[in-house]
Amino acid sequence: MKQYLDLMTRVLAEGTPKADRTGTGTLSIFGHQMRFNLQDGFPLVTTKRCHIRSIIHELLWFLNGDTNIKYLHENGVTIWDEWADENGDLGPVYGKQWRAWGTADGRQIDQLKTVLEQLKSDPDSRRIIVSAWNVGELDKMALAPCHAFFQFYVADGKLSCQLYQRSCDVFLGLPFNIASYALLVHMMAQQCDLEVGDFVWTGGDTHLYSNHMEQTKLQLSREPRSLPKLVIKRKPASLFDYKFDDFEIVDYDPHPGIKAPVAI
């Protein structure tokens, strides 16, 4: 994961001080890309420990179309707590947009089922895309989508994915985002009888919060370790039938965790 540390170094060296919605302040760059060959290992940051349980359960929650934090709480995941209302609701965030995008004529589009069908029937299509950026519902969301738009690409029997992330918290959020989408690519590839290819991450406003600087420097002082491997223990009937226990991350040997405040 040297690419991730290189991004941190770039933000520290080139970042512009900016105000932000949370009032915390950031160092920010605009436009950055990283490419991870998923054949080389699972791209989970090793210079600090990442909470794998949260990454997996959050993705399963998205895939279920859920937008209430009850499932997350039942599974010991608290990463969405700061944005939920008193009933645990978040409004029409990722799960709603991925699984039930509302149309003007009252229909709902399951974008994930659609892309699965496309990958199987027309893998050369240039329209295999999922968007969470529903302009008509942004004002109803507790938090506008940060990882907003992703596209799949098939070549030589391998499935690749590119994500556009409009806003990126490099220290806290990005390790989760990379691992989450890498996991999704593995799941989609298994369902479509493909090998995994590349995960390409593209960032818009890519920033370090001002209260993450010491943590960032600590992380940069650490040497990256070998990437772990992802094992998927079974092939469920569909993308939506995976369970937490279907996944195992093996040979993950990270440095200790580093705590940092969340900007809300």
UniProtKB/Swiss-Prot annotation:
Subunit structure: Homodimer.
GO biological process, one term: dTTP biosynthetic process
EC number per UniProt: 2.1.1.45
Primary subcellular site in the record, as a coarse category: cytoplasm
SUPFAM superfamilies recorded: Thymidylate synthase/dCMP hydroxymethylase (SSF55831)
Family: Belongs to the thymidylate synthase family. Bacterial-type ThyA subfamily.
Pfam families found in the cross-reference section: Thymidylat_synt
Entry annotation: catalytic residues: 146 (nucleophile)
Location(s), subcellular: Cytoplasm
Organism: Photorhabdus laumondii subsp. laumondii (strain DSM 15139 / CIP 105565 / TT01) (Photorhabdus luminescens subsp. laumondii)
Domain of life: Bacteria
Pathway: Pyrimidine metabolism; dTTP biosynthesis
Keywords (A to Z) from UniProt: Cytoplasm, Methyltransferase, Nucleotide biosynthesis, Transferase
The reaction(s) this protein catalyses: dUMP + (6R)-5,10-methylene-5,6,7,8-tetrahydrofolate = 7,8-dihydrofolate + dTMP
Record-listed dUMP binding positions: 21, 126-127, 166-169, 177, 207-209
Biological role: Catalyzes the reductive methylation of 2'-deoxyuridine-5'-monophosphate (dUMP) to 2'-deoxythymidine-5'-monophosphate (dTMP) while utilizing 5,10-methylenetetrahydrofolate (mTHF) as the methyl donor and reductant in the reaction, yielding dihydrofolate (DHF) as a by-product. This enzymatic reaction provides an intracellular de novo source of dTMP, an essential precursor for DNA biosynthesis.
Molecular function terms from GO: thymidylate synthase activity
PANTHER family registered for this protein in UniProt: THYMIDYLATE SYNTHASE, THYMIDYLATE SYNTHASE 1
The protein, known as: Thymidylate synthase
Binding site for (6R)-5,10-methylene-5,6,7,8-tetrahydrofolate: 51, 169, 263
One Gene Ontology CC term in the entry: cytosol
